[in-house]
Amino acid sequence: MNEKNWKEKVFVLLKKFRISNSVLWQIYKPFSRILNFIKHGDLYFFRSVAIEISTSCNRTCYYCPNSLEETPTNFIAQETFNKIIKQLEAIKFSGIVYYHFYNEPLLDKRLPNLIRYVKKHLPSCINRVVSNGDFLSVELADDLISAGVVDFAITIHDLDGEKLLRKLEPVIKKYPGYFMIDSLHGKALSNRGGAIEVETLDKKDTCTDPLELLQFDYKGNVLLCCNDYYRKHPFGNLAHDTLYDIWKGKEFSELRRELRKGIASLEICRICMGKE
């Protein structure tokens, strides 16, 4: 099993006391901002990275654009994945790494080995798997945790989640400090990717999504954020741009400054923030 860094040890310890993800995030935020200012001279440098390792999901939830579109199954090329990680290694990235966009990460059989590669090159990162839990078994959890995962965020999409919870009980019992279970039902919906129309959306005065998380698709494109399902707003590709050049690019930088001030110049942002 990979040796945990100190952040991972603290993360698992706090979760054993059932401290919620939102509280953990609030604890992590100020620390990461100070660290990013020291390392990059930028308080708002991204502290999380999400990599779309495939486009495949086994579910077609009504509130997800996957229910509206027939998406071909594509997998990130190993070369593209390695390039992303190597660029993150070059800037000494030490934040959180996710393995999803609108996909189910556990459908990619390469996931444990991808995480091992990340752990080798980004030893100070926290590896986090966001999943619907449908394919998670004790054996797979063993492999993923051995590879370097310290957190599973399982989202229950069914109205009655008892069946899934019963299925996951042996895994959670074996690794009590590694799981956070959440349900989408009973909460205000966000208009993810523009898939749903509801009378009341969560309204935002400002948006920090593109500031906090850098979203890669399977082709190596850097997208606006996790809501850009249709990939309408790419800001660069690691095939011909460096990570720093993309992040510090004029258009991307100006958009992030505007969003910090509550200015939504793009339609996707106005819809997401409840301004349209």
Give the location of each predicted region:
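Processing junctions and N-termini across compartments
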Residues: 51, 55-58, 201, 263-266
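Conserved alpha-helical substructure of the radical SAM core
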Residues: 3-152
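Short cysteine clusters
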Residues: 57, 61-64, 207, 225-226, ...
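Conserved AdoMet/S-adenosylmethionine-binding subsite of the radical SAM
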Residues: 86, 108-212, 217
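Secreted/processed peptides and extracellular or luminal domains of membrane proteins
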Residues: 63, 67-70, 213, 231-232, ...
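Exposed loop/turn and edge beta-strand positions of beta-sandwich/beta-sheet ligand-binding modules
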Residues: 47, 210, 229
